[in-house]
Amino acid sequence: MKRHLYGLLMACMSLFLLCASAFANEPKTAGKHGIKVLILCTGNTCRSQMAHGLLASYGKDVVVYSGGVRAEKRVNPKAVMVMREREIDISDHIPCKVDEYLNEDWDYVITVCDHAKETCPVFHGNVKHQIHMGYEDPSKATGSYEHVLNEFRRIRDDIDRDFFQLYCEMEERK
């Protein structure tokens, strides 16, 4: 009897987690005063996820999503690590394909790598501002573990600087 209940409990928890993760990626409207932003990259594992976490941390009036033209399976662990250094947790983010967002309306669609800019699909919804902010891919860095981690930090800091400036401009336009 205990095994049966345990099995049933585990099945229910698995279903709950599956539904919760699907709901977490579901686009919502930003409302009258919110700014709805989509950040795109190739795999949606490093740059776009760091930008997503940073931009969302600046204020509650920005609704942020991220996607990839070829989304990978999970967020890069080094990206998660360097974001934790800033007390931003992106460990529960799930890479998504940009196709999930093509019919949505967006205030901003931002590409953070050249490949995403070149292969960005046509959005069927209204896109008010399309911006490209290209960054090197820190996952391509080679060398010692510390050197690679420092590359992730450098890209994180570059994204932070540029996206905070963009956030301030967004606030002025509201």
Please tell me what each predicted stretch does:
Residues 27-29, 120-174:
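Phosphate-binding/catalytic loops
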Residues 49-51, 76, 119-122, 142:
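Short glycine-/acidic-enriched loop or helix-start segments at secondary-structure transitions
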Residues 8-19:
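Bacterial N-terminal signal peptides
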Residues 24-100:
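Conserved active-site segments centered on acidic
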Residues 45, 114-117:
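Short glycine-rich anion-binding loops that position phosphate/pyrophosphate groups of nucleotides
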Residues 1-9:
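Bacterial N-terminal signal peptides that target proteins for export
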